[in-house]
Amino acid sequence: MIQLEMSAIHVSLSYNKSYNKIKNKAEKLKKGGHGMVIDAHLHLWDKQYGRVGENKVVALKDGKSDFGGEIRQMMPPYMLDGRNTVEMLISNMNYARVSGCVVTQEYIDGNQDHYLLECRKKYPKRIKICCLYEEKEIKDEWIEQFDGIKICAGRLKDQNLLHHKEIFEKAERLKKFISIDMADGDAQTDAMEQLIETYPELRIAIGHFGMVTTDGWEKQIELAKHEHVYIESGGITWLFHKEFYPYPQAVRAIRTAIDICGIDKLMWGSDYPRTMTAITYDMSK
């Protein structure tokens, strides 16, 4: 797996106040020095109480969850009690030499806003956090407490992104970033491009490497040609799970993306802890 350390440096996307410091780290890395490794996409939860459509997702034990009636291995089996804690994450990050991370969210885990605020209070120099957009208004005062906003665009009841422009406007106005997992392929790319052009200063990270295993995924990558739009690879090992490590097709897809938007627009994301059911956190780099 290509370790996109240079791309990860672009966590300027989320580390607003540390931009110059991170930029200097990037220049050092270009000259052969030691760089900072940032995980741009992972998850935390204290208690999992999510949903997929109308179906509930509930943690069981040994890393398993009841996924709308289907039992799935949601986490490594050593996560015994269904909790995916910040303490275990930091331990994994320390071992894998990961300096910082962006904690995103997902409907299948339930809204973790309150827990993430606790996590950042414990480790303010290691993590940035997103509040979860759930197709209803989020007060400015609440958004202000977070670094970004997560939109699970592929799971929205109304998948026309133009009908959600208010949250994009708020993010730009409040100087927050958007972390977004888009619907498969090019289903939402035209609307997304309109929003990018409407809010040109808004910083956006497109997750799951543009849903790289679906037709039209390159259209999502092309969005990163815009100045403040980036692509992150959270979930790419899951999307290519049938071929296993070192994921040669995933490597080819990364090279294709480099040709489309340039390596400086790509960020590494692990999708911890779900992808750790097949590989270790360190291997995901």
Task: Identify the role of each PLM range.
Residues A8-V11:
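Short hydrophobic alpha-helical segments enriched in small aliphatic residues
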Residues N16-G35:
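Short, Lys/Arg-enriched N-terminal segments with co-localized hydrophobic residues
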Residues K30-Q105, N111:
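An N-terminally biased module of ancient metal coordination in phosphate/nucleic-acid-related enzymes
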Residues L42-H43, E106, F209, G235, ...:
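Active-site metal-binding loops of divalent metal-dependent hydrolases
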Residues N84-L89, H114-Y115, K136-I138, T189-M192, ...:
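Alpha-helical scaffolding within the catalytic cores
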Residues S99-G100, Y107-A187, Q194, Y230-E232, ...:
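Active-site gating/metal-coordination segments in enzymes
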Residues T213-K285:
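H/E-rich (His + Asp/Glu) clusters that bind or coordinate divalent metals
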